[in-house]
């Protein structure tokens, strides 16, 4: 396994002339039995990287749809050990890169070294910790790197150029640009300031840049071409599954 796996998968999509697709689903959603079926369908039907949420009781950075889904998973008893055990069982059938996203507390309780070791053994390629400041995460990033796991840097509109440059020194996998998309007349549009921020990120980072901003419809991908290398979507997928449709159907529309 390589620490560059996530970047490699996104760059493969770029070589095909398209954006990398990164669907997000909270671990154990919509239920224990169906979750891995959804993950395998996402992989089979074109996901380049699959992002699995680590449920947490206080998901301060999540929107209402993701938060509600994550809290349901917690109520169902989903935890990190369950996610890693299931991933170990299914990883050989998944060609996409695999990324875990969540908060620091569950990882800290698991034990940092033990987590890194178990996550690597399960086939995790990258990790996003939404509430871990860069300065506090340097040692953890180095620990993860020992196990070929990339700690993904998070940036956004409020990230100054000098801080982006700092993040870029230790960044592996890809840069995750967090944004809230404005809506006008029911059609989501990308504000000019976001476009400028993305241009800055592309200039600073020598790894791919992915945008997570609440994609609602496939037509929005067109607007991102040339601005980012990959797009993350979570709420749209959760709503799709909630409506009784499959992940395979979702990917066919977005691919």
Swiss-Prot record:
HAMAP family given for it? Trp_synth_alpha
Which protein are we looking at?
Answer: Tryptophan synthase alpha chain
Outline the subunit composition. Answer: Tetramer of two alpha and two beta chains.
Q: Which Pfam families match?
A: Trp_syntA
Instruction: Give the source's domain of life in one word.
Output: Bacteria
| Gene3D superfamilies linked to this entry | Aldolase class I
The organism encoding this protein is Maridesulfovibrio salexigens (strain ATCC 14822 / DSM 2638 / NCIMB 8403 / VKM B-1763)
GO molecular function annotations of the record: tryptophan synthase activity
Q: What does this protein do?
A: The alpha subunit is responsible for the aldol cleavage of indoleglycerol phosphate to indole and glyceraldehyde 3-phosphate.
E.C. numbers: 4.2.1.20
UniProt family annotation: Belongs to the TrpA family.
CDD domains (alphabetical): Tryptophan_synthase_alpha
Q: Which residues form the active site?
A: 51 (proton acceptor), 62 (proton acceptor)
Alphabetically sorted, this entry's keywords are: Amino-acid biosynthesis, Aromatic amino acid biosynthesis, Lyase, Tryptophan biosynthesis
């Amino acid at each position: 396994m390589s620490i560059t796996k996530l970047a490699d998968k996104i760059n493969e999509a770029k070589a095909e002339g398209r954006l990398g697709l990164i669907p997000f689903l909270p671990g154990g959603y919509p239920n224990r039995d169906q979750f891995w079926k959804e993950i395998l369908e996402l992989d089979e039907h074109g996901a380049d990287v699959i992002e699995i949420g680590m449920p947490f009781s206080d998901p301060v950075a999540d929107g209402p749809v993701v938060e509600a889904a994550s809290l349901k998973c917690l109520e169902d008893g989903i935890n990190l050990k369950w996610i890693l055990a299931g991933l170990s069982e299914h990883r050989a059938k998944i060609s996409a890169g695999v990324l875990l996203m969540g908060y620091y507390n569950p990882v800290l309780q698991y034990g940092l070294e033990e987590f890194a070791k178990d996550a690597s053994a399960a086939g995790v390629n990258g990790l996003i910790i939404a509430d871990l400041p860069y300065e506090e995460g340097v040692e953890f990033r180095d620990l993860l790197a020992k196990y070929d796991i990339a700690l993904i840097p998070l940036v956004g509109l409020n990230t100054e150029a000098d801080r982006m440059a700092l993040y870029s020194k230790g960044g592996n996998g890809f840069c995750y640009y967090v944004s809230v998309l404005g809506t006008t007349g029911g059609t989501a549009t990308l504000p000019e300031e976001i476009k400028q921020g993305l241009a800055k990120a592309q200039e600073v980072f020598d790894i791919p840049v992915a945008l997570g901003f609440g994609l609602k419809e496939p037509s929005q991908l067109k607007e991102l071409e040339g601005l980012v290398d990959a797009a993350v979507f979570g709420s749209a997928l959760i709503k799709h599954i909630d409506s009784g449709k499959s992940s395979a159907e979702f990917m066919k529309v977005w691919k």
